[in-house]
Swiss-Prot record:
Keywords: Cytoplasm, Nucleus. One of its GO terms (biological process) is response to heat. GO terms for cellular component: cytoplasm; nucleus. It comes from Arabidopsis thaliana (Mouse-ear cress). It comes from the Eukaryota. Its main location: cytoplasm. This is Protein HEAT-INDUCED TAS1 TARGET 3. Expressed in seedlings, leaves, stems, inflorescences and siliques.
Amino acid sequence: MDMNQLFMQSIANSRGLCHPDCEKANNEREDYDASQHAAMVAVNLISSARVILKLDAVYTEYSAQYLVDNAGKEDNQGEMDQQSSQLTLQNLLQYMDENVWNKKEDVQGEREQPLTVKDCLECAFK
């Protein structure tokens, strides 16, 4: 067989198959396209919400790049940035004191008779 026949035979054998590097590049391109579409949907939703909430008088077409560039941390502290919203041992103890421990004592005070094992088993197997 000469070179042309070998080349044509290899093309015929690999018809419909793609090189792994080619498939990887194609998949990455599809991922990029999906990310770009998701960014545009987010931009359109933000613009629509701003019009509905009357923050903007007209629909503004932001670019996805504008959204990425301006997605940084706010200058003012938000609710989750405040010290009272941070998960610390002190905040956890304060929450437990206000919402759990006191209410547990109230429930025990309301109960006239002590809870027995039989009561627990009956409740578990209902």
